[in-house]
Amino acid sequence: MSDHREQQKDEIDLLQNIIFDKMKIVESEPNFKIFMEIKSDIEDPKMKFHLTVTLNEEYPDKEPTFELLEVNNYLASAKVRDLESKLSSLCQEYINMPMLYQMYECILSFADEEEEKLLKEEKEIQK
C-alpha cells in the first residue's frame, strides 16, 4: 500500500471515529470516495448538506475533488457557491495535510451560522 493510500485510510478511520454515522465510504477503489451528511446541531435544523469527497492518488499532497449539495434548498445558490469557495480555499490552505475533518467543520460552522440567521428572521416575522 502506498504512503498516500495509507495516510488516506488512517484519516478516514479517524474521521469515522469522530463523526460516526454521518459519514460513509462510497468507494474504496481505485480512489476513496466518501459521503458526509452535515446539519446544524440546533433543534430541528432546516438545512442539510451532503458532501461527497473523492481523494485522488496523491491526496493530501493534492487537493481532493468534492461536490456539495444543500438538500432542503433553504439557501440561495449564491450562498452555496460561497461555501464551495470557502471549501476550495480551505483545501488549498491544507495541502500536504489531512483536511477532511476541517471540511466537515467548515460546513458545520456555516450551517450553524445560517440556521441562527433563519431563526432570527422567523422571530422577526412573528413579531
Where are these regions (language model features)?
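N-terminal ordered "arm"
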Residues: 16-42
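Canonical SH2 domain fold
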Residues: 33-70
